[in-house]
């Protein structure tokens, strides 16, 4: 009976004949599925983001503060200034994150989340109304729906249909309720930038998978859309955009070289000058020119904004002129010695970065009264709580991503184009590597890892040849258990994140006491 009902559902286009798909996959591809999922995701995320209040916009109570978000007026103020041709920002909106140059306040936050507020201008007084919670909720919802779309593309490919439906549902639950989405649901300007970055990176991953699974490969339309996603990301957060730019440029070079090789093979035998005149054809440059122009336009826009803000087209920020004013959040940094000595990125920080993101014991006190690994800690200016590990919040993704990485490294295992997938994965790996070397390590920077994890996960789960055994865990119990552990851990981490202190911990701080106090305060307000 269930099969009969599912077979009557209206369906959207999916790779291959729908009749050959399992009932679960047909449900995932039905036209009604994504709209219903979108409603659930938006309201569930809104509840988590606002602690159940569902206040997604609010008027300012103090200058630049609605008390519903942190620095919620930064992008409002940025847009209002941009509409006047002004690249400065009001100090009330940006607070201690202000970068002071020639007596004027600037921000290092990208302009794209501000530009995305343009449709609200006729209806909302952005000078008075904080819409940051709404923007965060929309961005988180879009990113999740794009990840589900990527799952749908991967699991319905002709070479992936023998993989278990339980694997499909476990990944669906993980993408919607797990570590790549839920832990970031906090209304701050930092989260808003990260969440919109996640939207553009997720769109890039979806398009990459469509190019890998489509019969005609990476069509001109897919390449153009991938460059637009990379360009929008560049105007949001440059670290993630670095990976997207690297991935799409490598893909274009590979395709261009492939066309040259194919045209050379098709040319008739004979002297080289005769081949050039008679049979040899230069690649069709039209499909490459449009993506390159789009990338150049976005890069030029970013360079122009940087020049107006910091006096140099390649300077996305200048933290040496940051105010670091003490605020109610208790954030105060006494200079940036590690930045000055080692720069923004340095390979000596990689061991500490791996520990911070995968085995977080950095908050444990040592015998001398400081923290563990203080020698490494001196190379970093900001180490932000809460402690969290991908191993706990994303066990299923890590297992499948490892399988995907193994498939890319070994010959004759990929059902998809191995060179193209490897180039995309290499581009997506660049942001995590940069973050492991960064002068600041923060919980929100985990977002930079997820596009790579999601892409490798879907390659490992559905991109391997069907005759090769599915990656572990293979049992229903194992898949469900890994997914549930990640989902529960992600919600717990979000709760801890919301009560975590801002900025660096002092040696005398005890995280356990801080969290106990935070829980008591939260319960007192609620009860």
Which residues fall in each region the model found?
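Juxtamembrane segments of multi-pass membrane glycosylation machinery
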Residues: 100-138, 156-161, 183-187, 375-388
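Specific aromatic-rich, kink-prone transmembrane helix
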Residues: 196-216, 225-230, 244-247, 252-254, ...
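Transmembrane-helix signature of polytopic, membrane-embedded enzymes
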Residues: 147-179, 199, 215-222, 261-264, ...
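Hydrophobic, aromatic-rich transmembrane alpha-helices
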Residues: 249, 377-382, 386-418, 457
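Perimembrane helix-loop-helix junctions
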Residues: 243-296, 407-411
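Transmembrane-helix motifs of polytopic, lipid-linked glycan transferases
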Residues: 130-161, 203-207, 402
